[in-house]
Amino acid sequence: MSCLFNSMSHFIKEDGGPHAIRQRICDYLQNNLPILDGMETRDILQLEAPSYEHYISNMRKSSTWGGAIEIQCACNIWNARIIVHDIRNGNRNNGNNNNNKNNKIEFLPLRAVHSTLIKLDFELEWSGGHYEPCRN
């Protein structure tokens, strides 16, 4: 199972755990639901793989790594705010950004324009090839 989906399962409580989270995200993609404003989901996926269908088929496999596309889908599905800390420089601070060495990316749900609509808020660490949940 991919570390991204395992990490998400620490915060997203879905029957079936990481596998169910992965499948729900793939269903979201397969239904061509929006990832970003202004671009069709199929077009975004075709930038990453030979075809839209190939991307989803491959992502359904437990050995396939997830990334920014899947994180954005999770935000949209579960109305989540997800912050990803880039810790490639070795600064492991579990989300406490007390210096400028920790770069972070904030993912927000596409339709939640007001903070009261966000139902879930969590942070992950990314080391360039691996995701871990931040446990504050």
PLM feature segments, named:
Residues 101-136:
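Structured partner-binding subdomains within large eukaryotic complex subunits
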